[in-house]
Amino acid sequence: MPDATMRGVAARIAADAGRGRAREALRREVGDLDGRCWLVERDMQLGGTSIPFVLFGPYGVVVLSASEVWTMRDVSVVRWAADDLAGALPDYPNPIRSGIYVPGHQGEPRWWCNDRADSAWIFGDDWLPWLLAEFGDLGFSAADIAALRALAAAAVPPGSVRLPSHPGSG
């Protein structure tokens, strides 16, 4: 296969490896949250994509992605995911927040908005607790988190697998 043919896919493989490293670093940051007060949902399907982390807790709901290098399209993706989740929480009184974690990012968190008016917080190492407290939302109580965990666990029986109705389909 000619090098020119493989360069495009090689760049995507390298970018995916960077996203994997960033997500692992964010997993460590999220791991410092108090599990009694925060529900951390991994790889939630929102807005047509898999979102690495969705946090439900006392300071609100936050949809988080992670990348070593972010783009304005990434801002749109996490915003679309947050908007999708907002549709599932019609009585929730606060906005669903969105953010992109960039490991090694220097400086304070910043709120970015693109030309489509999609927005997200960009933040780096050790800023997650500050960012969550910054929102000031009255989010989920510990009792709400316990109830949400129980409802989620009851939604799909343990060990069940949903298979396509016809072999070879989707």
Features from the language model and the residues they span:
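Active-site beta-strand-loop-beta-strand hairpin of nuclease catalytic cores
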Residues: 54-66
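Surface-exposed interaction regions that form or flank ligand-binding interfaces
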Residues: 1-49, 59, 68-170
